[in-house]
């Protein structure tokens, strides 16, 4: 068992429970009893504003901020539970609904079948099996956000993330082969060998810049078609039930307008087909994430095919700086902060001088082409106070952040509006 020893001689072993104070960073050995924050209880709807002096002050300030802010505040939510919580916290819609989790768990087998399909019939069977499951997910999320916009990002990660690890699978098959040859063990199945071939084929040296997002949708067009149909059918079902779904379809990792045009054409055809089949037409916006630097620099062209932009500032920061976030944060960020390369991680607070310029260029050129273009941000920066102020001044329409950061974003959006008004008056 792996262990470490603290300065006072305490030994901590693998599996021991630790508690961490999220404010101070102090670590406690064992499980520390906790009680819900009264402020969180207030936002959850379990505590009235006049029940606690602190809560009363928070209520007063947040209401004042809401009355002053120009920026809308949405949330990043992938489930109906997260969506409902965000709504209680004051979220005005979902700015990012990731669909990746809808392909995990028991559904992973269908993705494997899709990848291993040897013909159109097998591929269609795998997609048909996923359709009702996706539709149920969207019915739940659209229902939780009834009357508010829900921006659904079509599948973004590379397919290999839904497959077994290359090294582990290779070792497993090599061991099985050796046992079969030496001791007459069970032979490796054709399915496992086909799976290994697929994992090798899809393995990438730098998957963040590889076959993902819109590129995946163009290589396997049925995948995006499945998701668009599930969105349309879910919205039609809810509308028949008297609800008011407001879906928005967001295409990830677009770098050229031609990519978006191809996906948009197919999406519009599917939306029209579902409207004809169900007798229900649901107005659905189609837009894109701006997360590739080239997309920001050619935003005027991309706006010709997009009804909205949403900045994916996590990936935009990675590509703009040339950072691989998973590698660099632990490798040298603390040193960069110590020597003053930057004062805070650019993944926590937006780099206004560099990445911020890309944002401003995209806003200006996008709206020059399409004045009604709706623009938001759905990266983690959407809940960062300093970044929220930048987005206000850059002219964005809304920010989107995790449910628990929604109150912070509401407050900072109000402060940004007041500061801007004070500056204008001077």
Placement of each model-derived feature along the sequence:
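Conserved alpha/beta-domain cores
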Residues: 39-41, 46-426
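Conformationally flexible catalytic loops at phosphate/diphosphate-handling active centers
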Residues: 1-10
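Short, Lys/Arg- and Gly-enriched loop/turn segments at beta-strand edges
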Residues: 24-33
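Short, charged low-complexity linker/loop segments at the C-terminal edge of domains
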Residues: 35-37
